[in-house]
């Protein structure tokens, strides 16, 4: 899609869309009218597409037929082009042109002269009788010769000019196909066809022989004739000059298919008219093969498509062992059947032998590589190569070298080299003698010459550099190397120098050296920008920043040095913490960063190692040795001490340093630095000075990887080398410093972990090691009192008490959390490194905040805007990767914001107020605003959420509410000089810098936040996801962190390590159900959505930040352990009075036996005899299957690349997953790309469930459903009448068959009992108190394997509706009853795929189907949702007609109209797990099809659910236009010659399964480890295609044949033989299975039960003894009649459809007992 089209697609205004559509319609209406002038003929779609390639528009309204319309249209277009070149006011002579075509030239008939003569017999009919040898008389300067030049000789053309002195310029159209020079078929078969004979070839426009033109092969010389002169003029144009001109020049102006426009003019002798170098006619896809056999006629003679050759070569090389038979089969597979006629069988045999020959050659390179050679070996490489070439020329090439020469094909170009030709006559029409060798020789020589220069450049490269893999050395060796290169380069030609320059630019970074100058102290983000264009950087490019300048380090990467009074006394460089990387064992490594690349002056890398250079420095001059390498000391550098100090350590801590410069990609495996020279337990400092790399650590419990960038450093703690190993990989060229010490530098782990991390600007209060100063000492209880719950506490120090008093705290005694003392205040030790802002430089509205900060013992510091963070946020906004409001703004405005974010360089005053929730961070600000109303108009308050904005408005009612805004609205509104960013940790990363960049009037930014709470989360696709949070960015400006709260009492605050003001109150409760009134906090968005739908006030743990609530309910479920500490702290710090915990996550008990696990199952099926289960544990024996002989041969296919196309086209997980509004689905499973192609729909996927509910479920009240039923009675009657007519339903109403009903009930129960135990353990649905109309909805778990859904965008899943079990058994009984009734009247021409085997369907297709006419198939849009009231009326009408009792129908209608779910009452629709789901879908499908179309008895049709296929595309009923509006069901008809039905393809040879479908399903089963479970069923599906033998070539295309072969191979490898599909149905019928297992068993069958007796029964002839009571002589038939009458007379109105009514309906209504007798 073009950019303009994308802009139009973004139009959303309906009026604009309508205007755009109208403009498109007008343009489409005008263009065909213009096209009719050139293209008045109707063309087929392939012809129209071909013409459009030539820039010719056709009209869809053209109706005039023509035998060769496309060719004629091209002819007209050529004349139109010529008309643009002709002079408008001068007369032109038109030769061989019909008068009816004068309009194509854009000229008037009276203006020009027509000179037509007979050149061939058909010209007599065109132009009248003229002398065939006459020459046209031309009295004008310009002339046009139409479609005749190809019949003329150069002498005739010369004669035309010589007889007409006034003729200067001639436009001629030439019709000759360029492919005829190579005897190739037509390049444009839709326009013309070609046939080749001995001396001639035929050009057939449109493939119509009646309009064919026959040419001799000699006429093709016109395609390379650029100049025509007199006889022998090429030898001497002076001895035999022309009368008027020296020669004629011919220029090719245009080519369209075989039509060419030639421009011929006189050329004077004094004019130097050079020949063009080449004429190009068409792009070529044809090639010839090199000669590999002797004699030459044994080689491939013909020309073949390049794609065909390459595909065959790759096929032969990719198959493990290819045979000649495989090659022939592959050729048959890749060549279309209609194309076979143009190939010579003899040449195909030669072609197959060519492929077989090259496949047997060695495909592994036998050339040597200098990569592993030493310096001497590399210098001798060129000598060895020359010797090898010399001996190969004498003794013959190696197999690999020969293979390289014969695999490259010889291109056949559709070009000509223009020539000078003599004006000959009859000789012109003789066939030229083409020479392949002369045509290809110049190209071969050029190729050989080019390869020679390339090899020379390669050898010189090796000699000059000495080592290909050697990194950049110091500058001392560069002049010598350069001089040598210049001396050798002087011997090369110009072309050699050019080639060598190109090679060295790409291969050797030293020739010429690729240098990139970087300004000192460049920030990291600037360095990254400059290195994007050169990803493979040398170390000189990225490590030119000197540590000698650390004394002048600015704040925040500024280019201006700070003042003297702001510099650190210990030269401590400003650093940031990039992250903490925990190991599996609990060890943590903190990575800090200078934010830029660094370099120590004076480092000289002299030691060469594999993949790196090194230098070693030590204070005592001692060297360093380890396995394989040894380093001598180069002394010590002053810059090394500065680097140690910059990392926060004392210089005396380390006395040795190893400097290493890594090449890109070099690595060091896992090892430990346990040399004896170093004491055990010593610390090691590693500085990644420049470049990128990964540092892996491994212990016994797992591995962790650290990503290192420019300026990163970290320390391996004491004892690390004894417990861990580490490795290094250089992602880019990398420079590193490793500091060690030979004396003990480790310290024992302190018992007082209060030391502040030197590199954290403001530490986490939860980490007691981040305290500044010694506030208290953690003491452990005595050994004798280990059970004591409160630790020893020390008084709070004076600075802490003072800070607490300033914030209104009176609880000044120490508190604890049960294990250790809580610190109320955490001071920032490094705050003195920040530069303070000057109050006098600020505007008057900002100055009161300086006094406020001073009163709180806080400072206001200067912050330089971070352009990298600002640009990342604004770029994400512009690209619609973050936010909902801002991306919709004007694109120009967003672009200007991005530009400001990139370029704004200014400092802003920052006041950072950090504290716990309820610490009073914003209280002082609000009091200041209340006391100074004039300040309210000079500030803006920016908040992350609407809830927080409402909180500010409530606390400042006198303030203009427009001054309080969310962060996205803040970007749109005007700015003020002071901006308060409340709870700024929840703002997107980079927003603060971006806002300050685009709002240039902001002088003071006040930041309030809590670094212990959760921060803003962003998707991974955005740039800001890689940035550190705002808290981490600005915490360095916070003087202290106030870890105390006024909000919560000690009972709630101390457990989360917060000092509390309130000593009393607070409660922690536990409940089993969620309370009604309190706010509910849940861990996941999906739970929040569900509770909100139920009317609860719910928020997520992280989303409640900023709120204060009295009472709070926190739900604990399976997602709670996944939440971070920050998120849990946020949730626990919200409540001020009580927290109620509700545990909703319960463990599932182990499954029990069937009856014990489901207590209601016994009462439900107590009357089903248990002896039906006898023998169920006896496995059925597999039938003996004989081998089926192979009837055809399919070429071996490569199994590794079959799914590559879909894998490459597949989008990433985040793009494919569906967004439910709260979270994404989880349909893409595992890391296997093949498995990822298949969506895995799972019942536990809450996001998918929500999307599926929205897509599949419709809601309506019972009243609305009843109203719809009344309004659609006529529609239901129409459906039934059409159904009855087509399905031959008896006209009389059928009586109720009690015996059939009982039999169907037995079938339903047996099927139910045959299910797995897990399916039966649905105790709730068997509960008698479970409402009859209640439905449980859940997702269907499945792997989606449909062809159109594999690798495609994900869609909603399928729902399963779980009814009460007795309801299901009753409706299933009804469905089975109706099925049996339907089978009694179903016509033979209708096949319903229900309880039918594929063999039966195959027989139906083979014996009845008509493939000689177009077939019809149809799909539906939302079929289940469209089974509404009209179809329910049809079902009830049909069931009533077939004798189903009214009480059953009333109950069925009730559950359809009163279906209750957790969402509410459902509309009338089809639900899965209904009893009659499949049967009702099928019947409704038949009825709809019969109502819409006229279906006669001659139509064969197959139906199954919503699938249908017919062998005839029937006429639509005339009344359908009036009936269509009655139905919401919409069909998508398709008339095709390749019908599909239920996954089967219907063919003349029978039904077959799609091999692509089978292959994909097998691949999924293989990767899931389930192949043994599915291989037999897949083999049965595969069998139908396997049995066809050679006929599969008529059914499958090339891709399907490959998949068929791979399926065959997979099944054979898994031990499968061709199975028998069998004639039995795979239904759950225990009785039939027993008969298979024990053929001696006796079957006793009645209408009430089917039983199997393993032993011969003992029969008593007269069981009832003679007595005094009279015997009942009533006939059984009359008893049955009485029972049925009693059942049918049961009033439907008496049914309440609740309680045990369904139980009575199912158990007693037709058992011969009254429902009321119990």
From Swiss-Prot:
Q: What is its EC number?
A: 2.7.7.48, 3.6.4.13
Binding site residues for ATP: 915-922
Instruction: Provide this UniProt record's keywords sorted from A to Z.
Output: ATP-binding, Helicase, Hydrolase, Multifunctional enzyme, Nucleotide-binding, Nucleotidyltransferase, RNA-directed RNA polymerase, Transferase, Viral RNA replication
Q: Which reaction does it catalyse?
A: RNA(n) + a ribonucleoside 5'-triphosphate = RNA(n+1) + diphosphate; ATP + H2O = ADP + phosphate + H(+)
| Domain named Alphavirus-like MT: residues | 59-223
| InterPro entries for this protein | (+)RNA_virus_helicase_core_dom (IPR027351), AlkB-like (IPR027450), AlkB-like_sf (IPR037151), Alphavirus-like_MT_dom (IPR002588), DNA/RNA_pol_sf (IPR043502), Oxoglu/Fe-dep_dioxygenase_dom (IPR005123), P-loop_NTPase (IPR027417), RNA-dep_RNA_pol_alsuvir (IPR001788)
Q: Which residues form the (+)RNA virus helicase ATP-binding domain?
A: 889-1042
Please note every region of biased composition (Polar residues). Answer: 467-496, 556-568, 756-773
Limits of the Fe2OG dioxygenase domain: 653-743
Renumbered to this chain, region (Disordered) spans 467-513, 548-578, 746-796
Q: Where is the RdRp catalytic domain?
A: 1413-1520
Give GO BP annotations, semicolon-separated: DNA-templated transcription; mRNA modification; RNA processing; viral RNA genome replication
Signal peptide range equals none
Q: Where is the (+)RNA virus helicase C-terminal domain?
A: 1043-1176
Q: Which residues form a coiled coil?
A: none
A GO MF term: ATP hydrolysis activity
Q: What does this protein do?
A: RNA replication. The central part of this protein possibly functions as an ATP-binding helicase.
The UniProt family comment states:
Belongs to the potexvirus/carlavirus RNA replication protein family.
Write down what this protein is called: RNA replication protein
Write down the species.
Shallot virus X
The lineage is:
Viruses, Riboviria, Orthornavirae, Kitrinoviricota, Alsuviricetes
């Amino acid at each position: 899609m073009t950019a303009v089209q994308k802009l139009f697609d973004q139009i959303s205004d309906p009026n604009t869309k309508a205007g755009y559509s109208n403009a498109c319609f007008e343009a489409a209406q005008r263009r065909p009218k213009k096209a009719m002038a050139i293209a008045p003929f109707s063309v087929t779609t392939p012809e129209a597409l071909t013409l459009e390639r030539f820039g010719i528009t056709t009209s869809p309204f053209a109706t005039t037929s023509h035998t060769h319309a496309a060719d004629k249209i091209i002819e007209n277009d050529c004349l139109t082009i010529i008309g643009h070149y002709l002079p408008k006011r001068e007369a032109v002579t038109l030769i061989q042109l019909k008068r009816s075509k004068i309009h194509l030239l854009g000229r008037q008939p009276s203006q020009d002269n027509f000179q037509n003569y007979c050149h061939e017999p058909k010209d007599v009919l065109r132009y009248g009788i003229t002398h065939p040898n006459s020459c046209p008389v031309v009295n004008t300067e310009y002339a046009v010769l139409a479609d005749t030049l190809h019949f003329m000789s150069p002498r005739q053309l010369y004669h035309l000019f010589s007889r007409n002195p006034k003729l200067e310029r001639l436009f001629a159209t030439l019709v000759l196909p360029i492919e005829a020079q190579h005897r190739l078929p037509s390049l444009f078969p839709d326009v013309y066809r070609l046939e080749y004979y001995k001396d001639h070839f035929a050009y057939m426009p449109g493939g119509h022989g009646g309009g064919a033109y026959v040419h001799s092969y000699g006429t093709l010389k016109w395609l390379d004739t650029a100049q025509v002169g007199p006889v022998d003029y090429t030898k001497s144009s002076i001895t035999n000059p022309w009368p008027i001109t020296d020669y004629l020049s011919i220029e090719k102006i245009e080519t369209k298919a075989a039509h060419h426009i030639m421009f011929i003019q006189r050329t004077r002798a004094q004019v130097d008219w050079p020949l063009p170098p080449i004429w190009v006619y068409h792009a070529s896809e044809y090639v010839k093969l090199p000669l590999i056999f002797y004699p030459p006629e044994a080689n491939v003679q013909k020309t073949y498509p390049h794609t065909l050759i390459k595909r065959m070569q790759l096929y032969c090389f990719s198959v493990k062992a290819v045979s000649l038979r495989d090659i022939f089969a592959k050729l048959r597979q890749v060549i279309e059947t209609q194309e076979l006629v143009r190939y010579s069988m003899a040449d195909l045999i030669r072609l197959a032998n060519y492929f077989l020959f090259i496949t047997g050659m060695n495909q592994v390179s036998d050339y040597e590589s200098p990569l592993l050679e030493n310096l001497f070996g590399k210098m001798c490489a060129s000598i060895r190569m020359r010797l090898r070439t010399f001996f190969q020329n004498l003794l013959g090439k190696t197999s690999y070298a020969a293979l390289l020469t014969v695999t490259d094909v010889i291109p056949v170009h559709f070009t000509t080299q223009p020539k000078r030709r003599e004006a000959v006559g009859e000789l012109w029409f003789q066939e030229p003698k083409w020479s392949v060798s002369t045509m290809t020789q110049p190209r071969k020589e050029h190729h050989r010459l080019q390869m020679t220069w390339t090899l020379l450049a390669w050898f010189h490269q090796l000699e000059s550099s000495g080592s290909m893999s050697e990194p950049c050395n110091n500058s001392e060796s560069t002049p010598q190397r350069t001089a040598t290169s210049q001396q050798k380069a002087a011997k090369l030609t110009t072309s050699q120098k050019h080639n060598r320059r190109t090679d060295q630019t790409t291969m050797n970074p030293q020739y010429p050296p690729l240098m990139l100058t970087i300004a000192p102290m460049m920030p990291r983000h600037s360095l990254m920008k400059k290195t994007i264009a050169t990803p493979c950087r040398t170390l000189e490019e990225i490590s030119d920043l000197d540590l000698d300048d650390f004394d002048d380090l600015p704040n925040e990467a500024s280019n201006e040095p700070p003042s003297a009074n702001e510099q650190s006394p210990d030269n401590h460089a400003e650093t940031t913490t990039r992250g903490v990387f925990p190991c599996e064992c609990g060890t943590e490594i903190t990575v800090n960063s200078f934010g830029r690349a660094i370099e120590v002056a004076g480092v000289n890398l002299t030691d060469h190692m594999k993949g790196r250079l090194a230098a070693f420095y030590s204070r005592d001059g001692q060297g360093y040795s380890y396995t394989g390498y040894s380093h001598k000391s180069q002394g010590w550098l002053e810059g090394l001490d500065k680097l140690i100090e910059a990392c926060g350590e004392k210089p005396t801590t380390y006395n040795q340093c190893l400097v290493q410069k890594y090449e890109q990609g070099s690595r060091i495996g896992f090892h430990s630095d346990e040399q004896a020279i170093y004491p055990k337990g010593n610390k090691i400092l590693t500085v990644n000075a420049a470049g990128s790399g990964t540092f892996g650590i491994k212990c016994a419990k797992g591995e962790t990887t650290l990503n290192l960038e420019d300026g990163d450093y970290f320390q391996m703690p004491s004892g690390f080398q004894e417990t861990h190993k580490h490795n290094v990989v250089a992602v880019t060229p990398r420079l590193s410093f490793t500091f060690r010490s030979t004396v003990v530098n480790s310290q024992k782990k302190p018992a007082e972990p209060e030391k502040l991390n030197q590199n954290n600007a403001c530490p986490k209060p939860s980490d007691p090691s981040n305290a500044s100063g010694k506030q208290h000492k953690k003491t452990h209880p005595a050994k004798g009192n280990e059970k004591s719950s409160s630790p020893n506490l020390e008084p709070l120090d004076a600075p802490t008490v003072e800070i607490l008093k300033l914030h209104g705290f009176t609880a000044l005694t120490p508190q604890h959390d049960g294990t250790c003392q809580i610190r109320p205040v955490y001071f920032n030790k490094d705050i003195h490194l920040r530069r303070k802002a000057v109050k006098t430089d600020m505007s008057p509205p900002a100055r009161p905040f300086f006094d406020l900060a001073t009163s709180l013992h806080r400072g206001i510091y200067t912050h330089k805007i971070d352009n990298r963070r600002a640009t990342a946020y604004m770029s994400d906004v512009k690209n619609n990767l973050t936010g909902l409001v801002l991306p919709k703004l004007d694109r120009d405005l967003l672009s200007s914001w991005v530009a400001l974010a990139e370029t704004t360089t200014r400092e802003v005053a920052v006041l950072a107020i950090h504290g716990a929730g309820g610490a009073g961070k914003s209280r002082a600000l609000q009091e200041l605003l209340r006391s100074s109303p004039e300040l309210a108009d000079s500030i803006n308050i920016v908040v992350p959420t609407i809830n927080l904005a409402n909180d500010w408005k409530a606390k400042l009612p006198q303030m203009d509410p427009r001054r309080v805004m969310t962060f996205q609205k803040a970007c749109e509104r005007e700015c003020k000089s002071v901006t308060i960013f409340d709870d700024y940790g929840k703002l997107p990363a980079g927003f603060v810098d971006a806002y300050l960049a685009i709002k240039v009037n902001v002088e003071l930014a006040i930041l309030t936040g809590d670094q212990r709470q959760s921060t803003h989360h962003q998707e991974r696709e955005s740039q800001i996801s890689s940035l550190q949070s705002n808290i981490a960015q600005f915490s360095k400006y916070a003087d202290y962190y106030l870890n105390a709260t006024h909000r919560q009492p000690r009972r709630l605050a101390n457990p989360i390590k917060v000092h509390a003001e309130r000593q009393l109150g607070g409660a922690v409760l536990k409940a089993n159900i969620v309370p009604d009134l309190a706010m509910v906090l849940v861990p996941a968005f999906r739970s929040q959505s569900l509770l909100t739908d139920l009317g609860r006030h719910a928020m997520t743990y992280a989303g409640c930040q900023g709120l204060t609530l009295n009472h709070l309910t926190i739900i604990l479920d399976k997602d709670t352990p996944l939440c971070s500490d920050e998120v849990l702290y946020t949730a626990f710090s919200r409540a001020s009075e009580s927290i109620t915990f509700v545990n909703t996550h319960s463990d599932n008990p182990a499954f029990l036996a069937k009856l014990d696990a489901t207590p209601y199952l016994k009462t439900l099926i107590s009357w089903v005899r248990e002896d039906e289960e006898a023998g169920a544990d006896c496995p059925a024996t597999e039938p003996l299957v004989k081998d089926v002989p192979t009837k055809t041969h399919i070429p071996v296919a490569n199994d590794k690349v079959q799914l590559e196309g879909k894998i490459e086209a597949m989008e990433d997980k985040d793009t494919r997953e569906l967004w439910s509004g709260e979270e994404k689905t989880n349909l893409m499973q595992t890391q296997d790309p093949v498995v990822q192609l298949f969506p895995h729909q799972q019942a536990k996927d809450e996001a998918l469930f929500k999307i599926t509910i929205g897509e599949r479920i419709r809601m309506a009240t019972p009243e609305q459903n009843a109203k719809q039923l009344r309004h659609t009675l006529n529609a239901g009657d129409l459906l039934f009448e059409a159904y009855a007519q087509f399905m031959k339903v008896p006209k009389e109403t059928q009586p109720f068959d009690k015996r059939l009903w009982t039999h169907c009930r037995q079938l339903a129960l047996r099927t139910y009992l045959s299910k797995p135990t897990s399916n039966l353990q649905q105790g709730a649905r068997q509960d008698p108190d479970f409402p009859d109309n209640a439905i449980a909805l859940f997702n269907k778990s499945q792997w989606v394997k449909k062809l159109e859904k594999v690798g495609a965008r994900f869609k909603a899943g399928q729902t399963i509706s779980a009814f009460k079990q007795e309801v299901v058994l009753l409706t299933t009984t009804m469905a089975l009853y109706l099925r049996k009734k339907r089978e009694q009247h179903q016509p033979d021409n209708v096949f319903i795929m229900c309880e039918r085997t594929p063999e039966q369907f195959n027989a139906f297709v083979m014996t009845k189907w008509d493939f000689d006419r177009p077939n019809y198939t149809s799909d539906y849009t939302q079929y289940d949702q469209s089974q509404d009231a009209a179809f329910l009326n049809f079902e009830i009408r049909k069931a009533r007609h077939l004798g189903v009792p009214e009480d059953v129908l009333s109950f069925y209608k009730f559950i359809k109209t009163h279906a209750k779910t957790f969402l509410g009452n459902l509309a009338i629709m089809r639900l899965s797990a209904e009893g009659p789901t499949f049967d009702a879908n099928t019947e409704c499908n038949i009825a709809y099809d019969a109502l819409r179309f006229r279906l006669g008895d001659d139509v064969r049709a197959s139906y199954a659910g919503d699938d249908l296929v017919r062998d005839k595309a029937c006429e639509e009923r005339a009344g359908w236009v009036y009936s269509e509006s009655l139905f919401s069901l919409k069909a998508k008809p398709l008339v095709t010659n390749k019908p599909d039905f239920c996954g089967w393809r219907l063919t003349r040879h029978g039904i077959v399964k799609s091999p692509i479908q089978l292959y994909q399903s097998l691949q999924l089963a293989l990767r899931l480890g389930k192949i043994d479970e599915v291989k037999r069923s897949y083999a049965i599906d595969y069998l139908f295609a396997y049995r066809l033998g050679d006929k599969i070539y008529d059914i499958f295309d090339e891709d399907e044949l490959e998949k068929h072969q791979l399926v065959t191979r997979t099944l054979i490898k898994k031990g499968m033989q061709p199975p028998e599909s069998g004639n039995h149905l795979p239904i759950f019928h225990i009785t039939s299975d027993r008969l298979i297992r024990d053929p001696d068993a006796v079957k006793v069958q009645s209408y009430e039960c089917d039983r199997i007796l393993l032993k011969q029964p003992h029969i008593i002839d007269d069981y009832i003894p003679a007595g005094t009571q009279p015997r009942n002589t009533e006939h059984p038939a009359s008893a049955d009649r009485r029972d049925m009458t009693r059942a049918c007379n049961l009033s439907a109105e008496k049914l309440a459809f609740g309680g045990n009514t369904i139980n009575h309906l199912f158990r007693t209504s037709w058992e011969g007992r009254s429902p009321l007798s119990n």
